[in-house]
């Protein structure tokens, strides 16, 4: 069972180097790395050359846009399982071995998702369900993020490309939720995806340093996808009330930067949901 790992990257060198080190430490060796390099210079060439003899690396050049870069990578896959690591995540040494074993033992399932944690093993990159179970359109927001998703090749062959209007660098207001949109489409096509919270990938929690414009952009992406996939209003209201509650709590406790974060999240979700020209 071979893995195709699609790494879209721009602006990072040391993070990419550390990720490559984590790949080199994998106990399971049947994988290829497809690097979609969106830099305008050769900053990655030396470190890619350093690992080229350790495992297969395919270095592609492409313009900006996370979804566009991943779609370019999808054209080159040859593996049985496809994943989308972030350029600042780290794989634990036994990760691919664990995922390969799970797919071998669960031939009736088409995808596996895990959880994001910091290097101190605390949750990062959002809220996560504690219990394992099937992914559905309602819990998908708490059961997967791009770099914790593993899909059989059949899924990507059926679902197709990421929506290039969504995601960081898309040049649109919708700066997130491209992977959630992808999973919802996969579920709609009848594929079965499972969430295992013990499957963890290390990723820094950068919430405090994210710009408020980026926060709004992330919120707009979520709002856009909630509307596109016709979620019921009670569900939409839940995801509007959460940041509103965060605003109130942060104001009471005097955490004004946190208050601003939650407020901009709320504004973004509202603007994304009520955007003109919404597609369903």
Report residues per predicted region:
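N-proximal low-complexity "stem/linker" segments adjacent to membrane-targeting elements
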Residues: 1-25
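Non-catalytic, C-terminal membrane-associated alpha-helical segments of glycosyltransferases
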Residues: 213-221, 227-280
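Short aromatic/hydrophobic "clamp" motif used to bind/position activated sugar donors
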Residues: 82
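A short, conserved alpha-helix in the catalytic core of glycosyltransferases
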Residues: 146-151, 155-159, 166-199
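Conserved donor NDP-sugar-binding/catalytic core segment of glycosyltransferases
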Residues: 94-127
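Glycine-rich, basic loop-to-helix element that forms the pyrophosphate-binding segment
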Residues: 61-77
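Cell-envelope/extracellular polymer assembly enzymes that use nucleotide-activated donors
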Residues: 2-4, 32, 181
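Acidic donor-binding segment of Leloir-type glycosyltransferases
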Residues: 20-60
């Amino acid at each position: 069972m071979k893995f195709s790992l699609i790494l879209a990257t721009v602006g990072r060198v040391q993070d990419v180097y550390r990720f490559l080190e984590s790949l080199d430490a994998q106990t399971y060796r049947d994988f290829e790395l497809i690097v979609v390099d969106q830099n305008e210079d050769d900053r990655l060439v030396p470190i890619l050359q350093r690992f080229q003899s350790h495992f297969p690396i395919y270095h592609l050049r492409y313009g900006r846009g996370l979804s566009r870069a991943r779609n370019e990578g999808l054209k080159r896959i040859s593996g049985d399982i496809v994943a989308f690591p972030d350029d600042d995540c780290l794989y634990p040494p036994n990760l691919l071995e664990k995922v390969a074993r799970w797919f071998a033992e669960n031939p009736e399932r088409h995808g596996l998702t895990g959880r994001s944690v910091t290097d101190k093993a605390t949750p990062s990159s959002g809220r996560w369900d504690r219990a394992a179970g099937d992914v559905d359109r309602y819990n998908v927001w708490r059961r997967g993020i791009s770099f914790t998703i593993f899909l059989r090749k059949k899924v990507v062959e059926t679902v197709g490309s990421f929506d290039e209007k969504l995601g960081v660098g898309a040049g649109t207001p919708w700066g997130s939720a491209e992977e959630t949109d992808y999973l919802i489409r996969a579920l709609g096509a009848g594929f079965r995806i499972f969430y295992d919270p013990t499957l963890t990938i290390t990723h820094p929690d950068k919430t405090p340093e994210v710009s408020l414009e980026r926060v709004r952009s992330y919120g707009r992406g979520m709002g856009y996808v909630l509307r596109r996939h016709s979620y019921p209003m009670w569900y939409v209201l839940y995801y509007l009330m959460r940041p509103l509650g965060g605003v109130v709590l942060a104001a009471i406790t005097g955490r004004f930067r946190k208050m601003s974060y939650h407020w901009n999240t709320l504004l973004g979700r509202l603007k994304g949901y009520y955007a003109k020209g919404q597609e369903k």
